[in-house]
């Protein structure tokens, strides 16, 4: 594929990933059927990428419905992904580059697409039973991060108003939605009441609203690792939890927070 075409395709995929992070509906607004569908970014609308897209969407749905992120790396789920089409009710494509002029093969062959896959709930529930899991029917929490972040400059506390926190806010919301949850970034007024300051994050307070979970932590980029290093704390159902991650990128650090909340809220034994 010509270099110019490759550049356009990579650019479109980057835009698609950003849109995917914010386009999903609120998890609290979702009904159970919405949890049984997922969207992946694939190349073209033929069979080259469809099996991979189906497998990715099946994995995502199994995790969302059960609340068990450990299924992501479960070898049994990887094997099920080889036959994911057996559980599909319907699927559809949307051209990521719709409205962008055609550039070489991108017009007919290599254009990236959103592949949205809907699975049969009964089949998914049966698969979960075979995996030793059950559908999580409880109300899903809203994740509220109380975080101090630092890369090269001085640390800062992520707030709803912070101008240079836009990327972090979008990333955190997108990672929550990947797992069927929602996020709410606290205001500066809330953070002041909680006693949060750059580099100094207190124990997580009781959430101000029902069905919210406050996760306290620090996230710092360390060249010696290299990568982001984060540590998190939360209190849920009278128990304190602490976990963390190191040597990952920005998005994966936020995923680690969401996975921990997901496991605990869905009744599993801990954030890891």
Describe the role of every protein-language-model region.
Residues 36-39, 113-116, 120-123, 207-260:
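Amphipathic beta-strand/beta-sheet edge segments enriched in Tyr/Trp
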Residues 33, 52-56, 60-67, 119, ...:
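C-terminal/domain-edge helix-coil "capping" segments
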Residues 55-79, 139-198:
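N-terminal segment of the mature soluble domain
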Residues 35-85, 89-98:
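N-terminal Sec/ER secretory leader and immediately downstream segment
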Residues 74-147:
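Signal peptide-directed extracytoplasmic domains
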Residues 89-100, 145-147, 185-186, 195-230:
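A short, hydrophobic beta-strand-centered structural micro-motif
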Residues 11-21:
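Bacterial N-terminal signal peptides
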